[in-house]
C-alpha cells in the first residue's frame, strides 16, 4: 500500500518529536539503526588502514589539471583493493572534491570534467563493480569474502567503498575535507545516499 506523506524524521519512537538541536544525534542514530535493519544490512566499521598510491599522473586540459590513477588498499592484510581515477586543478591549495561511484566501463566525459574544473573542483571516480558485482553475486565478491558475517548487500558495499575514497582524500594535501560530495547515477545515487547516511564527513 502506498503512503501519501513522507515519514516524519523528527518523530521519536515514544511518539514525541525532536524539539532541540541537542536531541537530534540520538534521533539520527535511531534512524540509522532502522535503515540498517530494514534496508541496508550491517556493514563493517572503517578499517583504519586505508592507503592510496598514485600509480599514474600527468597534466591534462592544457596543463590546468592533473589526472591521476590512485590504487587504494585497506582492510585486513590489505585484502580490499581498487583503483580510482582523479582529475584535480593543477594549483596549490585545497579544493572541494566530488566522489563519484561509477558503473563498469563508465567515466566522466570531457565536458563533465571541464565543468568541474571550471568551478575549481576535483573529481575522483571508481568503478563500484571492483568491490562487488552488480548482481546477486555481490555476496561472493571481494568485500563480502573479506568481511564475512555481515548482512550488507551491493548498495551498502559500494557505499562503504565510497567512504574509503574519502579516507584516502583525507591523507592528501589538496582535498578540502569540509567540502566533500558523494554522487552517482541511478543505483549509484542510492549508493551515494547510503554513504552519506553513515559517513558524516
Residue locations for each model-derived region?
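C-terminal His-loop and adjacent cap/lid subdomain of alpha/beta-hydrolase
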Residues: 92, 194
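Conserved hydrolase catalytic core segment
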Residues: 197-201
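Gly/Ala-rich beta-loop-alpha elbow adjacent to hydrolase catalytic centers
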Residues: 184-188, 192
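Cap/lid segment of the alpha/beta-hydrolase catalytic domain
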Residues: 93-94, 98-174, 183
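Short alpha-helical segments and helix-capping/turn motifs at coil-helix boundaries
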Residues: 68, 81-85, 106-112, 189-190
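Residue in the alpha/beta-hydrolase core beta-strand immediately N-terminal to the catalytic nucleophile
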Residues: 179-181
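Non-catalytic accessory segments flanking enzyme active sites
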Residues: 7-90
Amino acid at each position: 500500500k502506498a503512503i501519501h506523506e513522507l515519514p516524519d524524521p523528527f518523530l521519536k519512537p515514544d511518539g514525541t518529536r525532536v524539539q532541540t538541536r541537542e536531541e537530534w544525534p540520538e534521533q539520527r542514530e535511531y534512524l540509522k539503526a532502522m535503515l540498517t535493519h530494514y534496508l541496508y544490512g550491517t556493514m563493517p566499521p572503517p578499517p583504519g588502514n586505508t592507503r592510496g598510491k598514485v600509480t599514474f599522473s600527468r597534466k591534462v586540459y592544457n596543463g590546468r589539471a592533473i589526472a591521476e590513477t590512485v590504487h587504494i588498499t585497506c582492510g585486513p592484510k590489505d585484502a580490499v583493493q581498487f583503483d580510482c581515477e582523479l582529475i584535480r586543478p593543477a594549483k596549490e591549495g585545497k579544493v572541494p572534491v566530488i566522489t563519484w561511484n561509477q558503473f563498469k566501463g563508465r567515466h566522466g566525459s570531457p565536458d563533465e570534467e571541464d565543468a568541474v574544473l571550471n568551478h575549481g573542483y576535483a573529481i575522483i571516480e571508481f568503478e563500484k563493480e571492483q568491490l562487488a558485482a552488480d548482481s546477486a553475486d555481490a555476496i561472493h565478491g571481494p568485500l563480502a569474502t573479506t568481511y564475512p558475517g555481515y548482512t550488507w548487500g551491493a548498495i551498502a558495499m559500494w557505499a562503504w567503498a565510497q567512504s574509503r575514497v574519502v579516507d584516502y582524500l583525507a591523507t592528501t594535501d589538496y582535498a578540502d575535507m569540509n567540502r566533500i560530495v558523494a554522487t552517482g547515477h541511478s543505483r549509484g545515487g542510492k549508493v551515494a545516499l547510503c554513504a552519506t547516511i553513515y559517513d558524516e564527513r
